[in-house]
Design a protein with these regions (language model features):
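A generic structural motif
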Residues: 84-85, 134-136
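A generic local structural motif
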Residues: 64-67, 114-118
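Short, acidic/small-residue loops that bind anionic groups at enzyme active sites
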Residues: 100-115, 154-159
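N-terminal beta1-alpha1-beta2 submodule of the flavodoxin-like/Rossmannoid cofactor-binding fold
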Residues: 1-78, 82, 86-105, 161-172
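Short, conserved loop/helix-junction motifs that constitute active-site signature segments
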Residues: 118-125
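Short hydrophobic beta-strand segments
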Residues: 6-9, 127-134
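Short, glycine/serine-rich, charged loops/turns that create anion-binding
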Residues: 12-13, 135-137
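Glycine-rich phosphate/pyrophosphate-binding loop and the adjoining helix
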Residues: 136-172
Length: 172
């Protein structure tokens, strides 16, 4: 069986837990890339729809997110390691999800489950997982992860506290 390509974006200060993730994934002989985004310049999505209408597949912001987007185009799994705020992902964590829009088309379709989702720009689904630090509302994060995976025509891989990092890696 061919290894799936795993992209992990770690938004925590100083790339906390990246070394542990790397060690566990090397033991598993997984194909992966970890991007520590804490010092990267990543703008918020402003919902301008340029990536759909004016410059298809290209965000209007020419910032460091382009490095993540280039990796995502060929990835099978997208994992985000994020701090939490008010039970949800921190602004850094939410930002790296919001900027996924260039991977999608503005057109909608029904999924096999009968739910609406955007059509994929590159015809490639991406499975989604979250590792959170802090007081995350796991139930809400799981539901949000499911909806995000659905929009990427992928599967939710799970939502894990940083203390469950081994369990998260077992799902990668």
């Amino acid at each position: 069986m061919e290894n799936r390509k795993i992209l992990i974006v770690n938004t925590l200060d100083g790339g906390q837990y990246s070394a542990e993730l790397e060690s566990l994934l090397q033991e598993k002989e997984a194909e992966f890339k970890i991007i520590n985004s804490d010092a990267m310049n990543i703008s918020h999505c402003v919902g301008c729809n340029h990536c759909w209408l004016k410059t298809p597949g290209v965000c209007v912001f020419n910032d460091d997110y382009l490095l993540i987007l280039k990796e995502l185009v060929t990835s099978d799994e997208y994992w985000v390691v994020s701090d939490t705020s008010f039970g949800f992902l921190s602004s850094r964590g939410k930002r790296v999800f919001d900027r996924l829009m260039p991977l999608l088309l503005m057109y909608l379709e029904l999924s096999e489950e009968g739910l609406m989702r955007h059509k994929l720009r590159y015809g490639r689904s991406i499975d989604v997982g979250i590792v959170f630090k802090g007081d995350g509302n796991r139930e809400y994060l799981q539901r949000w992860c499911q909806r995000t995976a659905l929009n990427l025509a992928g599967k939710p891989l799970g939502v894990f506290d940083v203390n469950e990092i081994k369990e998260a890696v077992s799902c990668m």
